[in-house]
């Protein structure tokens, strides 16, 4: 294998070893679902695409048999390291949360979960 390929693989392995993940769950009440889904499509996706420190992300609609009074959505953000995640939380997440609160008030609740991979197979 060429030396540059070996170096590239080593860099990828190092990145995944140090990666840091943030799971943001948005709970929307059933009365605001249509407006929230429009906001996701028109605003949240664009904001996420423009995040410089986010390596990869997954935006999902969460299915649950236990939630009847609304719906959950999840934004899984993958950072190269803990510091980038912490910087995001201190600035961008605060900004996103304030925008959502201003537009939706208590109708959309935000829950953050810090995921610290022990092992991954990405």
Question: Which residues does each predicted region cover?
Answer:
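Short amphipathic alpha-helical segments
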Residues: 32-59, 95-99
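Glycine-rich beta-strand-turn "strand-cap" elements at beta-sheet edges
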Residues: 4-12, 58-71, 98-122
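An amphipathic, aromatic/His-enriched active-site/gating alpha helix that lines ligand/cofactor pockets
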Residues: 49-55, 78-113
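Short, well-ordered beta-strand segments in beta-rich or mixed alpha/beta enzyme
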Residues: 20-27, 60-92
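Residues that cap or initiate secondary-structure elements
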Residues: 30-32, 83, 118-119
């Amino acid at each position: 294998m060429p030396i540059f390929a070996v170096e590239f693989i080593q860099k990828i392995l190092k990145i995944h070893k140090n990666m840091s993940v943030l799971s943001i769950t948005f709970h929307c009440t059933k009365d605001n679902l249509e407006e929230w889904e429009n906001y996701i499509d028109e605003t949240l996706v664009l904001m996420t695409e423009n995040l410089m420190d986010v390596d990869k992300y997954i935006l999902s609609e969460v299915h649950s048999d236990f939630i009847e009074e609304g719906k959950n959505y999840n934004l899984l953000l993958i950072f190269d390291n803990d510091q980038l995640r912490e910087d995001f939380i201190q600035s961008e997440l605060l900004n996103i949360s304030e925008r959502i609160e201003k537009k939706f008030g208590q109708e959309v609740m935000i829950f953050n979960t810090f995921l610290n991979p022990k092992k991954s197979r990405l």
